Amino acid sequence: LSAGYYDAYYNKANKVREVLKQDFQKVFDSGVDVIITPTTPTTAFGFGEKSDPLAMYMADIFTVTANLTHMPAISIPSGYDNNGMPFGIQMTAQQGNEDILFSISQDFEKNA
């Protein structure tokens, strides 16, 4: 980051990160063990099908929150669309609860 923009962007981003972490923590403190979401907003696109960098970035948008908040998350396959393209689900837990993610995802894959 340019020196003139450091405070404007980096520090603001860290404040947003803290708000997100607090929001997630409130959910976990209410008794939720795992948050389950789609991994991506759509099924996978074919190799070479997308060349727009923004569209490719947006395909990962649901994974950003776990990365920003440093919460452990795992993505596992959960099925295929009518064209045979895969899609998955992402599970997010609070820090230190990776064992819950591994256990639930293992059970899901065995029974899917």
Where do the protein language model's features map onto the residues?
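Residues within well-ordered alpha-helices
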Residues: 23-24, 62
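Short glycine-rich anion-binding loops that position phosphate/pyrophosphate groups of nucleotides
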Residues: 1, 40-43
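Structural helix-boundary/capping segments
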Residues: 1-22, 53, 57, 68-112
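Glycine/threonine-rich flexible loop motifs
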Residues: 45-55
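Thioredoxin-like thiol-disulfide oxidoreductase module
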Residues: 59-65
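Short, high-confidence coil segments that cap the C-terminus of an alpha-helix
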Residues: 32-33
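Anion (oxyanion) recognition and catalysis
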Residues: 28-29, 67
